[in-house]
Amino acid sequence: MTRRGALGLFVLPFAAIASPSATAKPLRIVCLDDGLAETLLMLGVSPVAIAGRDIWETWVVEPPLPPEIADVGTLLEPNLELLQQLRPDIILSMPYLDGIKPLLERVAPVTTIGLYTEAGQPYQRALEATRQLAGLVGKESEGEALIAATDAYFSEVRRQLAPLSARPIYVVSFMDPRNVRVYGKKSLFQEVFDRIGLANAWTAETNYWGFSTIGIDALATSSDARLAYLEPLPEGAGGTLTESPVWNAMPFVRNRSIMRLPAVHMFGAFPSATRFARVLASAITGEAARG
């Protein structure tokens, strides 16, 4: 695939790379990991069910979830009766759900794929998962196209942002007006930073999922850092922050270097990584245009 061809796969955000085969009987897949589900959709395969449609519509957003996909409830307490009614051929799970694996195996064979591990490297895990899923559903060429398109897109964003990449950036999600999750080592966002040539302002250790939960005062360590925060904000947080002396003393507040990002699935795979690169690049170029 040429670089131009790979980039073309992202002209329309998250357009499906493939259409399901009209001849082969598709596997009936229940997918309990949104990162795996978004990858399947990009391969042109719709699972019969996921867990938590409301979570998808709030945080994952893209690719859109087809309305016919069922919702089996929460991750840790899926509706086993509904699962049985769906008659899946396979259930895709993640290590986080190993505690309920025996229950799931009463319904269908379970395949566990871990995008997030103690070792980190979620980008490499996403690449491996893309190939594993593509092999499972007979979409090997589409899987390689998705990998090539993702790498090519990041190269293009890196070129676009090169003149604007000098200052580091904090990426946070607000837990409440005083505390945030800040994303760093082992996170999907860090992997994207590395590939598009940006510096992360948060260099301290993080947990299994690639974030630290800190008070907002801990964001004052870098005098020239920018802040990118992910929507949605907790109810009432915006008004409380504007009245907070601690918040108003932050260097990025005084320098007016704050960027609002639409929701991105921070625990996703290649589609989430691409969405993050796209919305962050838009915010950075918009900030530069405003001067």
Describe these PLM feature segments:
Residues 28, 109-175, 202, 266, ...:
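Extracytoplasmic substrate-binding proteins
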Residues 72-80, 206-216:
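Short helix-initiation/N-cap motifs at beta->coil->alpha
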Residues 181, 211-232:
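Ligand-binding pocket segment of bilobal, Venus flytrap-like solute-binding proteins
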Residues 55, 185-210:
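Alpha-helical, coiled-coil/dimerization segments enriched in small aliphatic residues
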Residues 27, 128, 222, 226-291:
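Structured C-terminal subdomain patch of bacterial secreted/periplasmic proteins
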Residues 28, 34-86:
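A short, structured surface patch at a secondary-structure boundary
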Residues 87-93, 224-225:
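Proline-aspartate-enriched helix->loop->beta-strand connector
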Residues 1, 5-23:
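N-terminal export signals
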